[in-house]
Amino acid sequence: MANNSGDSKNTLYCSFCGKSQHEVRKLIAGPTVFICDECVELCMDIIREETKSSGLKSSEGVPTPQEICDVLDDYVIGQSHAKRVLSVAVHNHYKRLNHAGKTDIELAKSNILLIGPTGCGKTLLAQTLARILDVPFTMADATTLTEAGYVGEDVENIILKLLQASEYNVERAQRGIVYIDEVDKITRKSDNPSITRDVSGEGVQQALLKIMEGTVASVPPQGGRKHPQQEFLQVDTTNILFICGGAFAGLEKIIAQRGKGSAIGFGADVKENDTRGVGEMFGELEPEDLLKFGLIPEFVGRLPVIATLTDLDEDALVTILTQPKNALVKQYQRLFELEDAQLTFTEDALNAIAGRAIERKTGARGLRSILEDILLNTMFDLPGLDNVDEVVVNEEVVSGDAQPLLIYAERKEEPATVG
């Protein structure tokens, strides 16, 4: 321990913070160096934080499929089958990482393909999974990607975004999740191979193959195009989980056609028009349907886990508006609370909002724009009004036939002014 003599010549100092032995409780000596108790505590805090942020380290740290599914239920309404598929796939993926090298049997990675109409929850499912597992997450739009060397975004820029999301911690990035949206937009432009290069369709599928299967990507820290003088970060993509999503409009016709015969004439079977919903037909999806849609066989092979999502009906959309932890109605009610007013939606108003989203074919994604449109004038006027106690939205407001009803603290009622 340190010498506590008052002689200044013998005073010892911490080699890290510079404090003297008289300013700290303990000073620990090593070969030609000293460290105080405060610096030791700081080092322990850093180590604890690093351990906490390093993601899942043991099998006990991987949530069970049921635990993952329960958290997904808090944020995503419906889609129970897709949640079960995702929960099992993600649990197995991180269990595989935590037991790598402990057995002679090498467990292959199972990337995931989400298929469902616009606004059904594909992106939200992927985002919520990353939050549950506390791993870096990034999203990419497949329509902006091109083959290397062409104008557009390189595929390796996806890995750069993941690296940025992990604050350039390469080890954490290598255990992250990448969500690639709109993969149905990078299909072959025709069934037959062309003599001209398809740099934004099949070419992007080819470019994605390597990073999805596993490769060491050389990523320029500042992004942009590569050049020989640049320094690169090496990121191994072997353990990165890739989730691809798309609406795949028209895929249901391919599925329906597969079940029909092509015979004609008097002896042919006459089949009635298929009246099943899109989501129900997606449940009968086979890999060959994706090939006919325009995905190349190698790309389909990299996505062994397929989860199909269904259209959201009116009841599901109303539930999305009101029930999740971050439900839209709760968000707008909080905004109005900041203006000391209560926002109330009648039941018929909620049904009408859900009905408009279905008419627009925008699913849950279109709900916010509908609410913004309904509440715009009221949100404009409210900060300048006094004593407004409650704002009521009914079906007539949603249909555009009336403005939200303002109820004042002295119980005087009048329609909101049009801004």
Swiss-Prot record:
CDD domains: RecA-like_ClpX
Residues that coordinate or bind Zn(2+): 14, 17, 36, 39
Alphabetical keyword list: ATP-binding, Chaperone, Metal-binding, Nucleotide-binding, Zinc
Domain ClpX-type ZB: 2-55
Residues involved in ATP binding: 117-124
Cellular component GO terms held in the UniProt record: HslUV protease complex
MF annotations from Gene Ontology: ATP binding; ATP hydrolysis activity; ATP-dependent protein folding chaperone; protein dimerization activity; unfolded protein binding; zinc ion binding
Record-linked Pfam families: AAA_2, ClpB_D2-small, zf-C4_ClpX
GO biological process: cell division; proteolysis involved in protein catabolic process
Gene3D superfamilies: 1.10.8.60, ClpX chaperone, C4-type zinc finger domain, P-loop containing nucleotide triphosphate hydrolases
Subunit structure, interactors included: Component of the ClpX-ClpP complex. Forms a hexameric ring that, in the presence of ATP, binds to fourteen ClpP subunits assembled into a disk-like structure with a central cavity, resembling the structure of eukaryotic proteasomes.
Similarity-based family: Belongs to the ClpX chaperone family.
Function: ATP-dependent specificity component of the Clp protease. It directs the protease to specific substrates. Can perform chaperone functions in the absence of ClpP.
Matches recorded under NCBIfam families: clpX, PRK05342.1
Name of the protein in question: ATP-dependent Clp protease ATP-binding subunit ClpX
Organism: Dinoroseobacter shibae (strain DSM 16493 / NCIMB 14021 / DFL 12)
The gene coding this protein: clpX
